[in-house]
Amino acid sequence: MKKLAKNILQKARVIALVSEKNRTTQADELTAIRAINNKIKLFLFFISGNFSAMKLHKFIAVFFVSFLFAQSSQPNSKTIQFLIEDQQIQKIYSSETIKSIFKNPQQKDVEKILLKFKNKPEKTRTLQEYSKIFITDKRINRALVFYVSNKNLFREVYVQTKVDPFLVLSIISMETNFGEAQGEFRLIDSFFTQIEYIPERKEWAEKQLKQFLIYCFNEKIAPESVKGSYAGAFGYGQFIPTSFESLFIDFNLDGKKDPYGWEDTIGSISNYLFQNQYPVDNNNFSINSEIWKSVRTYNRSDNYASTAIYLRNEILKEFYLLD
């Protein structure tokens, strides 16, 4: 196993160094060589212990990406090439601006994003394990406080959409813990990673990145400044860019769709479910019900939808006890 890892790493080193030699000064090349050698030493240190084949495979994947990382961050990367050739993007961003936005992808974050895609908790854990993350006394109590503080808003949203307010509470809790955990990654790094390194997500990520850049241009926001989830969702409700464009609404009618405002966020989560076959005048919150199926469109995971329903039920139960 160690011999295999060393052979892979030696090949990666050659490829990476050839890339560096083709595009850097001598000083930059020496810096790159030192960085690559340091990563190899760290990698070999890790595999010197009792690593399983699965863990070794993950380390090889991440370190191989780090060796080739410099190639994708250059103007000929798939991400930059796609944007430069897109007619809509051409009208609002120059080639130089696009290259500038992507000139410094965060390498450590790219590696973290790849690992997170491989270890999605809603996909890799059982329902019992996954639900324990979210169904806690602390989250339930926080949901009750949040609901009481925004009771009139929830009632107004319910009148318009007929979407259960406690289900919306549950989703807000799971997505960002009421705005506390909005994600640590720059969205440009999320989409860059998916386009460059995850072929099955490339086309999807290109659409999201394009819409995200259009949003940033219209709102006069620096794309590098927006952070969100590893998958590319942002704001209190964690909308992806295309869903933000089509389903996020200006609920308070102030002329702006605000992903960091609770009025628009609560209204938009309800609107999202309503537009995705949420059944009106239906109180069936069982697993595989029509309501469950609507929630599943928010995050296409059975565990997610089931946990959202369970958490909603627990919040409602405690609310009745308070009343």
Stretches found by the model and what they are:
Residues L9, L44-F46, F51-S52:
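Short hydrophobic targeting helices and cationic amphipathic motifs
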